[in-house]
Amino acid sequence: MGLQAGTRQLHGNLILLPVAVVMLLLCTSPVCATASVGLPADCSRLTSSSPSGVYVIQPAQSPPRVVWCDMDTEGKGWTVVQRNTYSTEITWKESWTTYKYGFGNVQGDHWLGTEYLHLLTQQGTYKVRFVVRDKANVTHYAEYDIFRVESESSGYPLRLGRLLSSGKDYLTSYYSSYGGIHDNMKFSTVDKDQDQHSGNCASSYGGWWYDRCQNVLLNGKKYILWPEICPRVTACRPSSWSNPPMCADCARGWGSATIPSRSPSLPSPITATHTVRNQLQ
């Protein structure tokens, strides 16, 4: 499969989703310094008894951010940075500035923001887990021991380390039959084309780290792409046989957390699934 097959269900309310789920989760290795008194630098700084839910974090050199912390996934303390489901109202074909600062709702579909991904991953060594659930309710994941997004001035390029899970590596290996490679590619949007393709991949598919378009695509409105699980655009197209619509092979995805433009007071945690944590805790 390209992703390692895992449990047939996710913790919390994810099990209620009868379609494919995609999630992008972050976890940090070294202990991160807390940017402000009382605010953790990421979800890994929460106590192990903390429930999954909405929290306010403050990475170094960043204003406070609202995120979804997953305290149920193995290891606990995962920071959810993207979520994309079958019923999303997000087009994912947003501008550079919109992607930079993030959009959506942390309790639903959202994008943390490329700038905040950069600030978050500058604090230490982070690992990442991409999670996909297929229509048979089987969960697959790909985990990398290093995840980093560089600065805006360099184009927010993606840096990935070694694949820790089993299966083919469609992010750091080059596949000429698909879209090339994703590792070390700059981020592209509809109004800022930084891919290696003759056209603008983002104008067709949404913001992502493209080479000659993609092997893997998690930021799409009508489909997700992951070879051997969601191998074709038409394979993951929503169909009319279910309400809400479900896709033929994979439906939609889950990822991380959304960030509001202003930092609210710390809300009470809301029970749910995916979070970020410090590996040394």
Curated annotation (Swiss-Prot):
One of its GO terms (molecular function) is cytidine deaminase activity. Residues 260-281 are annotated as: Disordered. Residues 270-281 have a biased composition (Polar residues). The keyword Chaperone does not apply. Keywords: Disulfide bond, Signal. The keyword Disulfide bond applies. SMART domains: FBG. Residues 1-33 form the signal peptide. Residues 34-246 form the Fibrinogen C-terminal domain. Expressed in smal intestine, colon and lung. GO terms for cellular component: collagen-containing extracellular matrix; extracellular space. It comes from the Eukaryota. Pfam families: Fibrinogen_C. InterPro entries: Fibrinogen-like_C, Fibrinogen_a/b/g_C_1, Fibrinogen_a/b/g_C_dom, Fibrinogen_C-term_domain. Disulfide bonds join 43-69, 201-213. Residues 260-269 have a biased composition (Low complexity). Shows a cytidine deaminase activity on 2'-deoxycytidine (in vitro), however shows no RNA editing activity (in vitro). This is Fibrinogen-like protein 1-like protein.
